[in-house]
């Protein structure tokens, strides 16, 4: 089975009405995954035996009308803890790590009787924009197997784009849900910071990380995001705000008439011409539906990437200190003393990009450089947040391209970290400000036929307006209905 021609609600109805059983659906899902996994390589591990066992249990007790995800196969990014199922963060350091507890988001999914088909590939410790930094293998873009799927949630995006699953969990620290969504022509939502618990997420940048979904369509995304949202006393940064029923507002009456859309002029700087054409057409379409489109300025956008990489790398250097070769994780062989354990375990266990960011972060936090780098970057973060606040005084959403280009060729940028980092120029400011943002399919490049994503940014905790805008665009276009001819190159 592939999930291109269905939705979560339709699938739920079929399961409730016994048009298909959870066991049949799960078997068909694995058949589909196995049919293209050799090409796409979206999964680090598959969970077939446990998934089929779980499906049989769900069939035995039955599925009620209020259990939306019961019996539904979904995927989980491999930096999200799953009890009894290896969680590697795509790193040699955690290659054999078997968690003893579930992340909060997984607990919620288990309570809703979902079926976990497997753990998806990512850049090691979620550090990267192409999924080429995985310690195990590179995931391929289903639209063109010679191109990257984006990162760090590239495996999750590729699994959804390939029709393996209706939805896959990802994490977004600086664009790691939205950029893969754009590259793969799917929907990817980063909720407001604090909307979803981070408990059980392998930490990269704790003040940036947020969990979200990659899905085939906007309404499924809204339904699944609501399921994992809400306060968690184990995560002191999780919000006490009530979680709205976003999907209930997505219907034939939803419109964008009078919606005030801000388009930052800085978001067109450096855009590839083919991307620019798609984004301008998308804005024209929204305007034709009654939205009011204004050009605005977010003047500190250009400082976002350097500030982000200082701050996020500083947090990463602190978070990754725990991997020392002593308590758990990879430990180097034939070590001579304690210092040897530390040095060799970390040198051999971490990949090049992770070590690069640890070094950058440690330098930024060191005596004599803290004020010049970390402190200054923190000030830039506040200025970026203020830019957004100023624009949102007179506008409902901010809209622009998700990325400056379409998916690039595998190997094209992996040896050029600075170019790779600049891919995040349009996404990292959102994480700096903790705002909700979603990438939706907006069209295809006239140059190479690859998908282009439209990024919709909302006010803090106003996911509803983001979903409304994306839903109206989606329902009045057909870009989300286009699917890759797997194996074909555009």
Curated annotation (Swiss-Prot):
Coiled coil: none annotated. It is an enzyme of class 6 (ligase). Gene3D superfamilies: Amidase signature (AS) domain. Keywords: ATP-binding, Ligase, Nucleotide-binding, Protein biosynthesis. GO terms for cellular component: glutamyl-tRNA(Gln) amidotransferase complex. Its EC number is 6.3.5.7. The active site is at residues 77, 152, 176. The keyword Transport does not apply. The keyword Nucleotide-binding applies. It catalyses: L-glutamyl-tRNA(Gln) + L-glutamine + ATP + H2O = L-glutaminyl-tRNA(Gln) + L-glutamate + ADP + phosphate + H(+). PROSITE patterns: AMIDASES. GO terms for biological process: translation. GO terms for molecular function: ATP binding; glutaminyl-tRNA synthase (glutamine-hydrolyzing) activity. Allows the formation of correctly charged Gln-tRNA(Gln) through the transamidation of misacylated Glu-tRNA(Gln) in organisms which lack glutaminyl-tRNA synthetase. The reaction takes place in the presence of glutamine and ATP through an activated gamma-phospho-Glu-tRNA(Gln). Heterotrimer of A, B and C subunits. Belongs to the amidase family. GatA subfamily. This is Glutamyl-tRNA(Gln) amidotransferase subunit A.
């Amino acid at each position: 089975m592939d999930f291109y021609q269905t939705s979560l609600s339709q699938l739920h109805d079929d399961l409730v009405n016994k048009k298909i059983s959870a066991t049949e659906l799960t078997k068909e899902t694995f058949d589909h995954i196995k049919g293209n996994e050799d090409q796409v390589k979206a999964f680090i591990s598959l969970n077939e035996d446990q998934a089929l066992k779980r499906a049989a249990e769900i069939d035995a007790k039955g599925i009620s009308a209020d259990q939306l995800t019961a019996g539904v196969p979904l995927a989980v990014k491999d930096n999200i803890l799953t009890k009894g199922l290896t969680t590697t963060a795509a790193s040699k350091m955690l290659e054999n790590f078997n968690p003893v507890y579930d992340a909060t988001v997984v607990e919620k999914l288990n309570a809703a009787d979902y079926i976990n088909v497997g753990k998806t590939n990512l850049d090691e410790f979620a550090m990267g924009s192409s999924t080429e930094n995985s310690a195990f293998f590179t995931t391929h873009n289903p639209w063109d197997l010679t191109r990257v799927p984006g990162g760090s949630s590239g495996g999750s995006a590729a699994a959804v784009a390939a029709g393996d699953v209706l939805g896959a969990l990802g994490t977004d620290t600086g664009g790691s849900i939205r950029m893969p969504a754009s590259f793969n022509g799917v929907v990817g939502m980063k909720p407001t910071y604090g909307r979803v618990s981070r408990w059980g997420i392998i930490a990269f940048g704790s003040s940036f990380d947020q969990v979200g979904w990659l899905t085939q369509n906007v309404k499924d995304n809204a339904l699944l995001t609501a399921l994992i949202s809400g306060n968690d006393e184990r995560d002191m940064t999780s919000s006490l705000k009530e979680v709205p029923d976003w999907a209930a507002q997505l219907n034939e009456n939803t419109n964008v008439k009078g919606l005030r859309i801000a388009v930052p002029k800085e978001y067109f700087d450096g855009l590839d011409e083919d991307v620019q054409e798609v984004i301008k057409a998308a804005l024209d379409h929204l305007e034709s539906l009654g939205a009011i489109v204004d050009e605005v300025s977010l003047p500190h956008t250009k400082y976002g990437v350097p500030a982000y990489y200082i701050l996020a790398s500083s947090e990463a250097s602190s978070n990754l200190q725990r991997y020392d070769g002593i308590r758990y994780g990879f430990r180097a062989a034939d070590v001579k003393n304690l210092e040897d354990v530390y040095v060799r375990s970390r040198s051999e266990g971490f990949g090049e990009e992770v070590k690069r960011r640890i070094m950058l972060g440690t330098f930024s936090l060191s005596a004599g450089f803290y004020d010049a780098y970390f402190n200054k970057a923190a000030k830039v973060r506040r200025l970026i947040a203020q830019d957004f606040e100023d624009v949102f005084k007179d506008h409902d959403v901010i809209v622009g391209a998700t990325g400056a280009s379409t998916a690039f060729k595998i190997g094209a940028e992996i040896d050029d970290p600075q170019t790779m980092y600049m891919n995040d120029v349009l996404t990292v400011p959102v994480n700096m400000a903790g705002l909700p943002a979603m990438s939706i399919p907006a069209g295809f490049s006239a140059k190479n036929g690859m998908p282009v994503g439209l990024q919709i940014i909302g006010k803090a905790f106003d996911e509803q307006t983001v979903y409304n805008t994306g839903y109206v665009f989606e329902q009045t276009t057909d870009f989300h209905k286009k699917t890759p001819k797997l194996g074909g190159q555009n």
